Amino acid sequence: MKQIFPPSITGKGSGGLGSGHASVLDHSFGKSDPYTLGVEEEYMLLDPETWDLVQHIDSVLAAAEDGEHHERIHAELMQSVLEVTTPVCRTAADVMRSLSQLRSYVAELARSEGCRVGSAGTHPFSLFERQRITARDRYRQLVDQLQYIARRELIFGMHMHVAVDDPEKAIQVMNGLLVHLPQMLALSASSPFWRGEPTGLASSRQMVFAAFPRSGPPPRFKDYADYAEVVGQLERTGCIADYTHIWWDIRPHPRLGTIEMRVCDAVTRLEDVVAITAFFQAIVKMYCELHESGKEIPTWHRLLTTENKWLAARYGLEAPIMDLATGRRNRVPVAQLVRRTLRDVEPHARELGSERELEGVREILARGNGSDRQLRVWNANRDIVEVVREISIATEAAAVSESAAN
């Protein structure tokens, strides 16, 4: 049988993938005000009786066409997934306002189409075999390329962008941020179930997405030219259509002029989303200022940062990880390193006006992450349907708050 390769594999054009994104070699690094923010969230569309996923994205998008936030709502690979994107925000408080409005809006839209929404890294019991691929060229071609790997990608993430005003700085800051991937993952982990089974992992989403090519922690780059050369080689040879088909846990986004943190599971509670976003923004600012002062940002071998990330995916906030900054011989709880980072970034959070939102990170450490909450519900009665119901109620709590405010 003759194998038919899509255009982006043969190098004969982009094949439609990544349309709207120029090559990393074709334009300068985007300019945005430093430390401005953007957040993307992926939500489940749920049947309110069975709490299984429903394939309602087209009807929800159609209902949103004339709405005030319709440009902020998008389809994803599966028809049971809805994505929202905030506008550019200056502060974590702006993110809170924007996502509160968006969660309220999509919850209302979903109800109008007979479904509900939920935010977590995986749906606890839905099966990827029962999902339909969204009828868009980008997604069809993605499945053509990745086959089973793409078809089983029934996972949900939360991505955060922070603007950096210089590409060289962005690369060095990204290198420094690798050591913080376990902290970000442990705070956001919300996928302890997969296909109806408790996995023993705080984030089973990480293991599903690890099958994707060009995923996981990125390598360390010497400078922006090093990054552009590597990505340009992939583009020139047709391995990828553009740089957005590099799915690292953290990556530069040249068109937007941002660093994008992608390691996080979708987060259920809005307050936790905002806290983690404030944490990320403050860390970026800390490393930017370290770079501007002429000091070297510390980095570590990819094997070590990848091992720490695995431990965070396995154990969540209880993960015993290597303290790479001090080199101590014994592993320490990731929560201890989160607290140390909080102390380091608090002055930066004050300057950013996000000190109050940053306190939410300590609240996550005190009461647990999304994975912990799901397991508490599960352990109470072994009812996995109730786990999904709780996810939806907690996700839509932002909608209730927004309605009360109005």
Explain the meaning of each model-derived region:
Residues 128-140, 199-215, 308:
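Short, low-order "capping/linker" segments at domain edges
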Residues 11-13:
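Glycine-biased, low-complexity coil/linker segments
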Residues 166, 174-221:
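An exposed, glycine/acidic-rich loop-and-rim segment of catalytic or binding clefts
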Residues 114-131, 194-199:
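Short, glycine/charge-rich beta-strand/loop segments that flank catalytic centers
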Residues 99, 136-143, 164-185, 268-281:
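Helical (often loop-to-helix) elements that flank the catalytic cores of nucleotide-handling enzymes
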Residues 160:
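An acidic/histidine-cluster motif and surrounding catalytic segment
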Residues 136-156, 220:
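Acidic, His- and aromatic-enriched active-site or binding-groove loops in soluble protein domains
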Residues 2-6, 18-113, 142, 209-406:
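C-terminal accessory/tail domains of diverse enzymes
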